[in-house]
Swiss-Prot record:
Residues 104-303 form the ATP-grasp domain. PANTHER family: D-ALANINE--D-ALANINE LIGASE, D-ALANINE--D-ALANINE LIGASE B. The keyword Iron does not apply. Its EC number is 6.3.2.4. It comes from Bordetella pertussis (strain Tohama I / ATCC BAA-589 / NCTC 13251). Binds 2 magnesium or manganese ions per subunit. InterPro entries: ATP-grasp, ATP_grasp_subdomain_1, D-Ala_lig_Van_CS, D_ala_D_ala, Dala_Dala_lig_C, Dala_Dala_lig_N, PreATP-grasp_dom_sf. This is D-alanine--D-alanine ligase. Mg(2+) 2 binds at E270, N272.
Length: 316
């Protein structure tokens, strides 16, 4: 295994609001790769430079970063320039998927279902937004993950505080129609025609509040994998996940988040191109449901590592 992959860097930590989660993901991936015989080394991009990365002699890297500067296409572009194969999606798909506004626009262009939304700025009359989207609604920063900066707005009086919280992270704020239903997520492995959805997971958090604490630290959240769904509904959700993944040009692996409404219609919420790999994370859970261990999953993701941008032919 060591010879197959050579010297591997596990990129983790970083400088985003999700640094602590990334530290947990990276350590887990590193230990799993070592157990599989891979010559793996941790590399904290929040503490070391691109020059250090270029000099490290990695033959490929596993990106275990979440959020800005790790999941948004910037690092992927740098790795393309350095010629270092990496896991996950390329610069464009990563950038599109990290921007929740652009993600929804792409999905709508492909005829995929996603809740109605508006983009809010400093000049938006906040009191009018609930009249258009209804209440409750969701306000969130477009470029953060792990539920950072998200508020469920129950009434008109909550709009200002919710907007100000989200605006701490982004110049624009995404207001989204709230869909009542079951929270689902689907992991997808592979690229192109070979990309396949893993079993659907249902998430049931206490009080319906699946926030940062419940995602990564709470043992109170319940997960059902595979989700208790009629076979045709599960197949439909998986198919929509694969289409959503393909529409954004995703590669390698990812996770698609949904709400399933009371009529069993799936609504797309977000695309994650570098999902969590912690003890509470969902992609490893889905992999276990098909007999794939955590280490097997890490090796499978690493095996897909590649540079995605084709160099143009030289004109001499």
């Amino acid at each position: 295994m060591s010879k197959q992959f050579g010297k591997v860097g596990v990129l983790y930590g970083g400088r985003s609001a999700e640094r602590e989660v990334s530290l947990m993901s990276g350590k887990g991936v590193h230990e799993a790769l070592l157990s599989a015989g891979v010559d793996a080394h941790l590399f904290d991009t929040g503490e070391r430079s691109l020059a250090d990365l270029a000099a490290a002699g990695f033959e490929r890297v596993f990106i275990a970063l979440h959020g800005r500067y790790g999941e948004d296409g910037t690092l992927q572009g740098a790795l393309e320039l350095l010629g270092i194969p990496y896991t996950g999606s390329g610069p464009l798909a990563s950038s599109l998927s990290m921007d929740k506004i652009m993600t929804k626009r792409v999905w709508l262009q492909h005829g995929l279902p996603t809740p109605a939304f508006e983009v809010l700025g400093g000049s938006t009359e906040l009191r009018l937004v609930p009249d258009r989207l209804g209440l409750p609604l969701i306000l969130k920063p477009p470029h953060e993950g792990s539920t950072v900066g998200i508020t469920k707005v129950a009434g008109y009086s909550d709009m200002k505080a919710a907007y100000e919280l989200a605006a701490r992270f982004d110049a624009e704020v995404l207001a989204e129609q709230f869909i009542t239903g079951r929270e689902l997520t689907v992991a997808v492995l592979g690229s192109g025609a070979a990309a396949r959805a893993l079993p659907v997971i249902e998430i049931v958090a206490p009080g319906g509040n699946y926030d940062y604490e419940h995602k990564y630290f709470s043992d109170d959240t319940q997960y059902f994998c595979p989700a208790d769904l009629p076979a045709d509904v599960a197949a439909d959700v998986a198919a929509v996940a694969e289409r959503a993944y393909a529409a954004l040009g995703c590669e390698g692996w990812g996770r698609v988040d949904f709400i399933l409404d009371r009529e069993n219609r799936p609504w797309l919420l977000e695309m994650n191109t570098s999902p969590g790999m912690t003890g509470h994370s969902l992609v490893p859970m889905a992999a276990r449901a098909v007999g794939m261990s955590y280490a097997d999953l890490c090796v499978a993701i690493l095996a897909e590592a590649a540079c995605k941008v084709r160099s143009p032919a030289r004109q001499d």
